């Protein structure tokens, strides 16, 4: 027999983010990690129409900024002649609007579970066997979060002619689990990496999915923050992680001798062998995390 099941999973809920204000402080624009900048409306006391960086005075197009990667501060970590290598130029602009960075990052995951079973017995019913193979492929809504498991099991029973009954089972599982760092974090870089910690405070005017995350030459993290002070969440996904590989072999055998209908002798032997390899890593090129951005 073959059985297959398919499920999806998704982020249960996310904060009720405001979608009215973007980067900055005191209704003034700046490439910070705050949401106290100008409004996404052009008019009014806090409107972007009062901001030279957004109203077209600097960018040449109202409602647009110069792209964060071609700003003067960011030229120190991303030379301007390298911009074409990531699809940008000195004329690239950034639209002043609310972005759904959390929704863009956490996409629905999927779970596929497949089981194949063979079983049979002899004509007289004294010998029977069972073989089962299972495969689980679980991709979470967090990018880079996966669990894959293969399981194989054998079982059998034989009633011998000399009043002895033998039973045996053999089970093997291999589990491969991978995830980016997702625990609570208190800084913005490599010393305390956390995908969740570096995503949920993202300003509304920053789109994570729309910003390249890796330096075209060194592979280091690049991001919108002035002087590159925050590690790009997508760089975290692709360059950091925790991995666990588990192998387990277990089962047992038993033999029973029937002395009479009401009396028997039984011998059982069981075994369970387990190994686990754990790896935590981060590639070279992360941000030093000098900005404290408490999350969690």
Predicted segments with their positions:
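Outer-membrane beta-barrel initiation region
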Residues: 104-109, 120-122
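Repeated loop/turn-to-beta-strand initiation elements of outer-membrane beta-barrel proteins
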Residues: 124-129, 163-166, 262-265
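Outer-membrane beta-barrel channels and translocator barrels
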Residues: 111, 123-125, 159-161, 258-260
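Surface-exposed loop/interface segments of Gram-negative outer-membrane beta-barrel transport/assembly proteins
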Residues: 3-95, 140-145, 151, 155-248, ...
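Residues on the lipid-exposed face of transmembrane beta-strands in outer-membrane beta-barrel proteins
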Residues: 116-120, 154-158, 251-257
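Outer membrane beta-barrel translocator domains of Type V secretion systems
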Residues: 125, 132, 155-157
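A beta-strand signature from Gram-negative outer-membrane beta-barrel systems
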Residues: 1-3, 111-115, 128, 132-139
């Amino acid at each position: 027999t073959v059985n297959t099941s398919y499920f999806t999973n998704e982020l249960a809920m996310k904060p009720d983010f405001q979608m009215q204000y973007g980067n900055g402080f005191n209704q003034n624009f700046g490439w910070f990690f705050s949401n106290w900048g100008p409004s996404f409306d052009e008019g009014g006391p806090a409107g972007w129409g009062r901001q030279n960086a957004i109203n077209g005075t600097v960018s040449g197009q109202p409602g647009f900024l110069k792209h964060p990667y071609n700003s003067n501060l960011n030229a120190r970590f991303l030379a301007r002649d390298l911009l074409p290598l990531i699809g940008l130029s000195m004329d690239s602009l950034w639209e002043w609007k609310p972005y759904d960075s959390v929704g863009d990052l956490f996409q629905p995951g999927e779970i596929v579970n497949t089981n194949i079973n063979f079983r049979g017995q002899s004509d007289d019913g004294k010998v029977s066997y069972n073989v089962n193979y299972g495969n689980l492929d679980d991709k979470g809504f967090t990018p880079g979060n996966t669990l894959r498991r293969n399981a194989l099991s054998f079982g059998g029973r034989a009633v011998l002619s000399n009043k002895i009954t033998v039973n045996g089972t053999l089970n093997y599982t291999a589990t491969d689990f991978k995830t980016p760092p997702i625990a609570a974090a208190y800084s913005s870089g490599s010393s305390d990496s956390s995908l969740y910690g570096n995503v949920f405070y993202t300003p509304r005017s920053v789109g994570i999915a729309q910003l390249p995350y890796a330096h075209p030459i060194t592979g280091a993290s690049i991001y919108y923050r002035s002087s590159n002070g925050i590690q790009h969440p997508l760089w975290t996904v692709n360059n950091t992680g925790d991995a666990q590989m588990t192998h387990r072999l277990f089962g047992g055998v038993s033999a029973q001798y029937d002395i009479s209908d009401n009396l028997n002798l039984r011998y059982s032997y069981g075994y369970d062998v387990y190994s686990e390899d754990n790896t935590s890593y981060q590639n070279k090129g992360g941000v030093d995390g000098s900005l404290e951005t408490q999350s969690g």
